[in-house]
Structure formats: C-alpha cells, structure tokens
From Swiss-Prot:
GO terms for biological process: cytoplasmic translation; maturation of LSU-rRNA; translation. PANTHER family: RIBOSOMAL PROTEIN L7AE FAMILY MEMBER. Belongs to the eukaryotic ribosomal protein eL8 family. GO terms for molecular function: cadherin binding; RNA binding; structural constituent of ribosome. It is found in: Cytoplasm. Keywords: Acetylation, Chromosomal rearrangement, Cytoplasm, Isopeptide bond, Ribonucleoprotein, Ribosomal protein, Ubl conjugation. Component of the large ribosomal subunit. The ribosome is a large ribonucleoprotein complex responsible for the synthesis of proteins in the cell. It comes from Homo sapiens. InterPro entries: eL8/uL1-like (IPR050257), Ribosomal_eL30-like_sf (IPR029064), Ribosomal_eL8-like_CS (IPR004037), Ribosomal_eL8/eL30/eS12/Gad45 (IPR004038), Ribosomal_eL8/Nhp2 (IPR018492), Ribosomal_eL8_euk (IPR001921). This is Large ribosomal subunit protein eL8.
Amino acid sequence: MPKGKKAKGKKVAPAPAVVKKQEAKKVVNPLFEKRPKNFGIGQDIQPKRDLTRFVKWPRYIRLQRQRAILYKRLKVPPAINQFTQALDRQTATQLLKLAHKYRPETKQEKKQRLLARAEKKAAGKGDVPTKRPPVLRAGVNTVTTLVENKKAQLVVIAHDVDPIELVVFLPALCRKMGVPYCIIKGKARLGRLVHRKTCTTVAFTQVNSEDKGALAKLVEAIRTNYNDRYDEIRRHWGGNVLGPKSVARIAKLEKAKAKELATKLG
C-alpha cells in the first residue's frame, strides 16, 4: 500500500432528497375582507351559549333540585335514607308484571258489571252474589290495617313519596309484623296499577293458585334484600357529600397547610 494514501471504505449512498410537494398558493379574492369579531363588552353580538345555569326555572323545578341537593349535603337519618335503596330493575319488572294481573277494576268496568247483573235480575234469572276477585289493595291507611292484621302477603312502597313522613314508619311496621316489604322506584308506576296518577303503597292480599309460585319466589328474594337486612339498613346514614366548590376550597386550604409545614421543616 503506497504511503500517504488512506484506505477508502465503501461510501454509503446519500439519503434521497425528500421531494417537497409544491403547495398551490391559495388565490385570495381581494373582494372578501377579513372582519374578525370582537366579543368584548359592548362590542359584537355574543355567540349562542348554553345558559341553562342562569335560567329562572319554574318553582316546582327549583324545589325538586334544591331538595335533591339538600339530601346530598345534609346528614340523612337511616329511616329516611332507606328509601334510596330501591329494588333492582329485574325483580321490579317481575313484580310489576305480576301486579298487573291483579289491577282493581275501573269505574267503567264496575258500571258494566253492575248493569249486567241488574239486567239478569230484571230478566228474573235470580241474583247470585259473586265472589270478590283477588286484587291489589292501595293506600297507606288500607295497607297499614292489612299489615297490622297480618293479612298482607307482600307490601310495595314507592321511594319518592312526598312528604316522606306518610310512609316512613311502614318498613319498621312490616318487619315487626313479619310481612315482607320492598321499596320500588316511582309512585307513578304504582299509581298506574290502581288507575291513579300516583300511589304511595300497594299490597298483595291474595293471588290465584297459578301465581302462587311466582309470588313465593318474589317474596323470598325481597325478604333477603329488605327484611333480613333491616339491622344493616338502619345503621347507614345518608348524605354528607360536599359540593365541588367546598371540595376545591378544602383542597386549597390543605395544600396551603402542607406548603407551610414543608417550609417550617425546611
């Protein structure tokens, strides 16, 4: 190898130059002027925003919202808090399906029945008194009497009764008398069963022989969820949940305290 000559290694091929795409220049029409909006005070008309928070709602909406927030903020005693533990959807659907079979008759149905009976009597076929069919019994006073006499097989209470004092004693009474009870969502759902707008509570007294198995299954599930868990339920207080502002304020104070402590310890 001759002196002064360096050994030549293999040359790496240079990276291919990235071919830049030539962007076509946007042709700006000079007739279209830019007029940016200024949303400062007293300037342009403001854009459409969601102003739900600032709407003056009707009184009944305000009250129900305030009630919901109070139930979260204040400490709710167990007797009232138990009404938040409603029956699960699947069991509730089965229960309502069964209850639908035992709806009481409407005014029109009663009128037609009595009319048919009167026509029979007028035709001289004799008036045979019919046996009363098993139906749901509704209303606080009726259900309370049935529970006290141990005639109710199952009691269904609405979770949103207002005022709650109307039914607050019922779970304790049912447990004392050994009657299975459950809390279901919606007084309107119970109301539909008995042809009213709303209903506080309904009770099963008797069912037909073909539905006894279905009722027994429901009673077993309900007893496990409510009657047997009564001691546990009456220990649970509700509410006492702070709002986002209070949580943020407390967090800020805690942060400041921690910072101060850190500087002291150095």
